[in-house]
């Protein structure tokens, strides 16, 4: 299987420690690089039962009951941009419980697994790279992916914290191209509410009711916004009243534009405005004429059974005819005008050069 490897003396927790390629190969049995199916160069590393071995030996190692929480697992990221995360410990099924798959993008892992900083088994993450002494910016997205995947696998198998030793080893992540990969991990952080709003995603209510809010209502839902307006003493305009107010505002604006366009001296306008303000004219109230409930000839009370004549008066059943109440309305003239309006006279133009 290989020799035991001691890591405590040369790696600091939470830092991306610089390790030369020769030292990495000597201490961790760094496997020879190879071209994968996508023509990208990447190393193969595997830690089984506390022993470093090549990926070809990983299939012969039987996992112990607390295999994932007691023994350090190895992940490796390869490719020019570090797009794929591969697990070389008994295939990827031990890390992401998705079955033996060739690789998963960081976004897919972040979406499918819960984000946690510390798991129940005390695993810690250490980044080993040969690109120089750099610190991850930030390291939390990488930690969350590894912790959540291993923790989910252990919970499904029914493992408990009591099986863990007092000082469990760390989980190592080897990044051959650490700079691009760490920057890519920083993009996995969940967007803030402002970024979600700018991206067009729904934003939760600002009052914390759990429903979605609307930027037009101060990022609150309709119910919370109504309560907010009632508490602040604001009057919420309804649909018809708001439309009437908008129409009146448009009328006022049109009148203002028309008055500005007229060539009237400013002194006269100011004087008229001042006089109208000091001496307001009484408002003319147009009252609707009450319907007559008595006959205009015999003064008999007819109520709702009266007959309205075209002359403008109301009569009973006996005096409703024009010859009974000496009606002065010109029925013939009205009919003649109606016929003339309905049948206009069309005359053709006279020919000037008529032969």
Curated annotation (Swiss-Prot):
GO molecular function: DNA binding; zinc ion binding
Keyword Glycosyltransferase tagged: no
Keyword Metal-binding: yes
Zinc finger (AN1-type): 289-335
Residues engaged in binding Zn(2+) 3: 309, 311, 325, 327
Described purpose of this protein according to its UniProt entry: May be involved in environmental stress response.
Protein known as: Zinc finger A20 and AN1 domain-containing stress-associated protein 3
Natural source organism: Oryza sativa subsp. japonica (Rice)
